[in-house]
């Protein structure tokens, strides 16, 4: 039952249903790919409604995707092994030769003392200290700017790994800080993604309006606007920061782009970190880098959201096309079945008409034959019927069999005349 307010409001027509949001056709018309997270308030449905609307991925589909991911991992492992293992073997051989050369040139140092020194150097590097030159002049990795940058890498889940807490208090605080900060940063990332997507959406809408005036198809407009959005974002959040990092950090162009992509995808290997070199940086350098990470992650979130919307639209269109194909197939089957039934009915009618016509002709011929019998065969003497009296039947002479022919109760000598009459009628 509809509420009374909905029945009484002007312009409401009874019997007109609202568009079905679950219908693939209406969903494909109303849902456009957006460039950000949903800005509409979330409405929690009841348990019954959620059970009917949520589509759970089948185990067969999950297993297929799992196998695809495992295959992708095997391919990646094979490629990385082929590219990186020869370099690793070369470096290992080189360091062994250098150690032997150093010991041979410095007889006062034995191999045990050299190994202990190398272990201390490795521990210092793992702690974030670069043991080169005069370590007393090195900048601390735990000053306010560096600590701010580290806290940012914790809540963004990047975790470069170049520095990490070494004390028990630092580890405990890092655990609590991450559990509280990651959800908080998620809300911030969603809000920034919405605003960034709105800005880009308005720009793309203007571009689409321009192309519409040029009578360009909607599909081409959508493809062109998407390419423009991605290219503009790549220039603003990938190419330009890579140029800046190349200039400040002294990296190559490939290393700078590598750092940008690894950072904005939250992989964060830690082999390249902005502000991690043994040079003097400005105080606001690392906080600015973190804010760039925030906006860049929001951009990537907007791109991923747009791709997800596009995939949903494509899926709905595919379901719609499959539904239309099934409808056409069902319609074709129904038409073929109806045509077959109609053909069978027509054949039955024609056969029945021919049968009726043949029956009518047979009856007519039988009637004519009976009339001719009465006119032409009266001289012949017929045998008595079963209704004749016994006295009358006894008066007649007994019937003689002539080649076993007894036609219409005629005596045998009239059978030849009867056959001749039938031949004349035919």
Swiss-Prot record:
<comment type="subunit">
    <text>Homodimer; disulfide-linked. Forms heterodimers with other 2-pore domain K(+) channel subunits, such as KCNK1, KCNK4, KCNK10 and KCNK18. Interacts with AKAP5; the channel is recruited to postsynaptic microdomains by AKAP5 where it can integrate neurotransmitter receptor signals. Part of a complex composed of AKAP5 and ADRB2. Upon AKAP5 binding, the channel is no longer sensitive to intracellular acidification, membrane stretch or arachidonic acid stimuli. Interacts with POPDC1; the interaction enhances KCNK2 surface expression and is inhibited by cAMP.</text>
</comment>
<dbReference type="GO" id="GO:0098839">
    <property type="term" value="C:postsynaptic density membrane"/>
</dbReference>
<dbReference type="GO" id="GO:0016324">
    <property type="term" value="C:apical plasma membrane"/>
</dbReference>
<comment type="similarity">
    <text>Belongs to the two pore domain potassium channel (TC 1.A.1.8) family.</text>
</comment>
<dbReference type="GO" id="GO:1900039">
    <property type="term" value="P:positive regulation of cellular response to hypoxia"/>
</dbReference>
<dbReference type="GO" id="GO:0030425">
    <property type="term" value="C:dendrite"/>
</dbReference>
<feature type="region of interest" description="Selectivity filter 2">
    <location>
        <begin position="266"/>
        <end position="271"/>
    </location>
</feature>
<feature type="binding site">
    <location>
        <position position="267"/>
    </location>
    <ligand>
        <name>K(+) 1</name>
    </ligand>
</feature>
<dbReference type="GO" id="GO:0098782">
    <property type="term" value="F:mechanosensitive potassium channel activity"/>
</dbReference>
<feature type="binding site">
    <location>
        <position position="158"/>
    </location>
    <ligand>
        <name>K(+) 1</name>
    </ligand>
</feature>
<comment type="function">
    <text>K(+) channel that conducts voltage-dependent outward rectifying currents upon membrane depolarization. Voltage sensing is coupled to K(+) electrochemical gradient in an 'ion flux gating' mode where outward but not inward ion flow opens the gate. Converts to voltage-independent 'leak' conductance mode upon stimulation by various stimuli including mechanical membrane stretch, acidic pH, heat and lipids. Reversibly converts between a voltage-insensitive K(+) 'leak' channel and a voltage-dependent outward rectifying K(+) channel in a phosphorylation-dependent manner.</text>
</comment>
<dbReference type="GO" id="GO:1904551">
    <property type="term" value="P:cellular response to arachidonate"/>
</dbReference>
<dbReference type="Pfam" id="PF07885">
    <property type="entry name" value="Ion_trans_2"/>
</dbReference>
<feature type="intramembrane region" description="Pore-forming; Name=Pore-forming 1">
    <location>
        <begin position="144"/>
        <end position="170"/>
    </location>
</feature>
<feature type="region of interest" description="Selectivity filter 1">
    <location>
        <begin position="157"/>
        <end position="162"/>
    </location>
</feature>
<dbReference type="GO" id="GO:0042802">
    <property type="term" value="F:identical protein binding"/>
</dbReference>
<keyword id="KW-0407">Ion channel</keyword>
<feature type="binding site">
    <location>
        <position position="157"/>
    </location>
    <ligand>
        <name>K(+) 1</name>
    </ligand>
</feature>
<dbReference type="GO" id="GO:0032228">
    <property type="term" value="P:regulation of synaptic transmission, GABAergic"/>
</dbReference>
<feature type="binding site">
    <location>
        <position position="159"/>
    </location>
    <ligand>
        <name>K(+) 2</name>
    </ligand>
</feature>
<keyword id="KW-0633">Potassium transport</keyword>
<feature type="transmembrane region" description="Helical">
    <location>
        <begin position="172"/>
        <end position="192"/>
    </location>
</feature>
<dbReference type="GO" id="GO:0098685">
    <property type="term" value="C:Schaffer collateral - CA1 synapse"/>
</dbReference>
<feature type="region of interest" description="Important for GNG4 binding and L-glutamate release in astrocytes">
    <location>
        <begin position="51"/>
        <end position="61"/>
    </location>
</feature>
<feature type="binding site">
    <location>
        <position position="159"/>
    </location>
    <ligand>
        <name>K(+) 3</name>
    </ligand>
</feature>
<feature type="binding site">
    <location>
        <position position="267"/>
    </location>
    <ligand>
        <name>K(+) 2</name>
    </ligand>
</feature>
<dbReference type="GO" id="GO:0005886">
    <property type="term" value="C:plasma membrane"/>
</dbReference>
<feature type="transmembrane region" description="Helical">
    <location>
        <begin position="224"/>
        <end position="244"/>
    </location>
</feature>
<feature type="intramembrane region" description="Pore-forming; Name=Pore-forming 2">
    <location>
        <begin position="253"/>
        <end position="283"/>
    </location>
</feature>
<dbReference type="GO" id="GO:0033268">
    <property type="term" value="C:node of Ranvier"/>
</dbReference>
<dbReference type="GO" id="GO:0060044">
    <property type="term" value="P:negative regulation of cardiac muscle cell proliferation"/>
</dbReference>
<feature type="topological domain" description="Cytoplasmic">
    <location>
        <begin position="193"/>
        <end position="223"/>
    </location>
</feature>
<dbReference type="GO" id="GO:0050976">
    <property type="term" value="P:detection of mechanical stimulus involved in sensory perception of touch"/>
</dbReference>
<dbReference type="GO" id="GO:0003231">
    <property type="term" value="P:cardiac ventricle development"/>
</dbReference>
<dbReference type="GO" id="GO:0090102">
    <property type="term" value="P:cochlea development"/>
</dbReference>
<dbReference type="GO" id="GO:0022841">
    <property type="term" value="F:potassium ion leak channel activity"/>
</dbReference>
<dbReference type="GO" id="GO:0019228">
    <property type="term" value="P:neuronal action potential"/>
</dbReference>
<keyword id="KW-1015">Disulfide bond</keyword>
<feature type="topological domain" description="Cytoplasmic">
    <location>
        <begin position="1"/>
        <end position="61"/>
    </location>
</feature>
<feature type="glycosylation site" description="N-linked (GlcNAc...) asparagine">
    <location>
        <position position="134"/>
    </location>
</feature>
<feature type="transmembrane region" description="Helical">
    <location>
        <begin position="288"/>
        <end position="308"/>
    </location>
</feature>
<protein>
    <recommendedName>
        <fullName>Potassium channel subfamily K member 2</fullName>
    </recommendedName>
</protein>
């Amino acid at each position: 039952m509809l509420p009374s307010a909905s029945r009484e409001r002007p312009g409401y027509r009874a019997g007109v249903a609202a568009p079905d949001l679950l219908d693939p056709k209406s969903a494909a018309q109303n849902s456009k790919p957006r460039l950000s997270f949903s800005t509409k308030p979330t409405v929690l449905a009841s348990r019954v409604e959620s059970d009917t609307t949520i589509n759970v991925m089948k185990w067969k589909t999950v297993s297929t995707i799992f196998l695809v991911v495992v295959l992708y991992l095997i391919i990646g492992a094979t490629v990385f092994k082929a590219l990186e293992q020869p370099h690793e073997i070369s470096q290992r051989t080189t360091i062994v030769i250098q150690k032997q050369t150093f010991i041979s040139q410095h007889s006062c140092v034995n191999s045990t003392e050299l190994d202990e020194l190398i272990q201390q150097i490795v521990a210092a590097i793992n702690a974030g200290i670069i043991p080169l030159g005069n370590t007393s002049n090195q900048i601390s990795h735990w000053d306010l700017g560096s600590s701010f940058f580290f806290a940012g890498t914790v809540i963004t889940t990047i975790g470069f790994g170049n520095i990490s807490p070494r004390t028990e208090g630092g580890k405990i605080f890092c655990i609590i800080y991450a559990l509280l900060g990651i959800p908080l940063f998620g809300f911030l990332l969603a809000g920034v993604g919405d605003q960034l997507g709105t800005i880009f959406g308005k720009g793309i809408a203007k571009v689409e309006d321009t192309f519409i005036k040029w009578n360009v198809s909607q599909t081409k407009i959508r493809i062109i606007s998407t390419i423009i959005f991605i290219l503009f974002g790549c220039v603003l959040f990938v190419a330009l920061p890579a140029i800046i990092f190349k200039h400040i950090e002294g990296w190559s162009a490939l290393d700078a782009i590598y750092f940008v992509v690894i950072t904005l995808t939250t992989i964060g290997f830690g082999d390249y970190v902005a502000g991690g070199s043994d040079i003097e940086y400005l105080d606001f350098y690392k906080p600015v880098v973190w804010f760039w990470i925030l906006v860049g992650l929001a951009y990537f979130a907007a791109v991923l959201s747009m791709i997800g919307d596009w995939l949903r639209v494509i899926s709905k269109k595919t379901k719609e096309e499959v539904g239309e194909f099934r409808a056409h197939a069902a319609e074709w089957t129904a038409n073929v079945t109806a045509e077959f039934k109609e053909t069978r009915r027509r054949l039955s009618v024609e056969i029945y008409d021919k049968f009726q016509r043949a029956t009518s002709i047979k009856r007519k011929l039988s009637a004519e034959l009976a009339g001719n019998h009465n006119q032409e065969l009266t001289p012949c003497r017929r045998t008595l019927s079963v209704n004749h009296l016994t006295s009358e039947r006894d008066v007649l002479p007994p019937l003689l069999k002539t080649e076993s022919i007894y036609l219409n109760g005629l005596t045998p000598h009239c059978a030849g005349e009867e056959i001749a009459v039938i031949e004349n009628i035919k």
